[in-house]
Curated annotation (Swiss-Prot):
Function comment: Involved in succinate export with YjjB. Both proteins are required for export. Participates in succinate export, but also in the export of other dicarboxylates, such as fumarate and malate. Contributes to succinate production under both aerobic and anaerobic conditions, and increases fumarate and malate production during anaerobic succinate production.
Mode of membrane association: Multi-pass membrane protein
Native source organism of the sequence: Klebsiella aerogenes (strain ATCC 13048 / DSM 30053 / CCUG 1429 / JCM 1235 / KCTC 2190 / NBRC 13534 / NCIMB 10102 / NCTC 10006 / CDC 819-56) (Enterobacter aerogenes)
Any further remark recorded for this protein: YjjPB constitutes a split-type ThrE family transporter.
Quaternary organization: The transporter is composed of YjjB and YjjP.
Family: Belongs to the ThrE exporter (TC 2.A.79) family.
Compartmental location: Cell inner membrane
GO biological process, one term: succinate transport
Protein name, entry field: Probable succinate transporter subunit YjjP
Main localization category: membrane
Keywords, in A-Z order: Cell inner membrane, Cell membrane, Membrane, Transmembrane, Transmembrane helix, Transport
Single annotated GO MF: transmembrane transporter activity
């Protein structure tokens, strides 16, 4: 009996760790609930119930009429689909009886978020913003302006993130830098005829697309509270970006977007 309780306690910890990994790294709430439940049942539980909010998870496992509940506080670790994929693989292996709870615990301890080199991330963000500008009739000169502005802005954003700057302040400063660089470059004689779409494209790196998509997905699938919380966070980030853009345009007297 004591051994069964000890095993249930271990499985409960693994289930809530599974849910926490997913929620911390950007998975939608329905996936968090589904995978934690599947893992618990794969490891011998009769039922797994969970309540998910934006800053905490409460999870209960039931086996032979015995309930065990655990609570964990959630902290955002940034979007990382590598972690989500790794957790999915572990759950699938447990369902196929390739892993017991001790193996799952070992696999969880080995999960490390995939991090790309900073220089590569800066380069790819600059190129993606420049391509958007070119596709929206910004021309090659507009793409050059966008590339330089968004590259520097992404570098600044990484520096501020590394120093644990508040996300809203981070986005505001980054938007200010991107708009300042692109706007002042458009004043140069070489770019005097460049469309101002370059200014808009240079702040695309700050669009919180993933949180907004997850917010809508959560609300459609019944996780209203989590969806609204994610929507509010994404809206605040968007507001901070707008403030940074307006500050730069007002300070330097830049012409508006067209």
């Amino acid at each position: 009996m004591q051994a069964d309780k000890s095993e249930q306690r271990a499985v409960t910890r693994l289930c809530i760790q599974c849910a926490l990994y997913l929620l911390q790294h950007g998975a939608e709430s329905a996936l968090v609930e589904e995978l934690s439940t599947r893992l618990g049942r794969a490891l011998g539980m009769d039922s797994v119930e969970s309540a998910i909010s934006s800053n905490a998870i409460v999870l209960t496992t039931i086996k032979d009429g015995e309930c065990l509940t655990s609570t964990r506080k959630n902290s955002d670790r940034g979007i990382n689909m590598h972690v989500v994929t790794e957790v999915q693989h572990i759950v699938i292996m447990a369902e196929h009886k390739l892993l017991d709870y001790k193996d799952v615990e070992k696999r969880f301890s080995q999960i490390k978020p995939l991090r790309y080199p900073r220089w590569l991330l800066v380069l790819m963000v600059g190129l993606s913003c420049a391509c958007f500008c070119k596709l929206n009739n910004g021309g090659w000169d507009g793409a050059v302006v966008t590339f330089f502005a968004s590259t520097v802005a992404m570098y600044i954003r990484q520096l501020l993130t590394h120093r644990s700057m508040h996300p809203q302040i981070n986005f505001c400063i980054t938007a200010f830098v991107a708009t300042t660089i692109s706007g002042l470059m458009l004043r140069l004689p070489a770019f005097s005829e460049t469309p101002t779409i370059a200014m808009a494209a240079s702040v695309l790196l700050l669009v919180p697309g993933f949180p907004l998509i997850n917010a809508v997905a959560d609300m459609f699938k019944g996780h209203i509270n989590t969806g609204l919380a994610r929507w509010a966070i994404a809206s605040l980030l968007t507001l901070a970006t707008c403030i940074g853009v307006v500050m730069a345009m007002t300070m330097w007297g830049l012409r508006g977007w067209a």
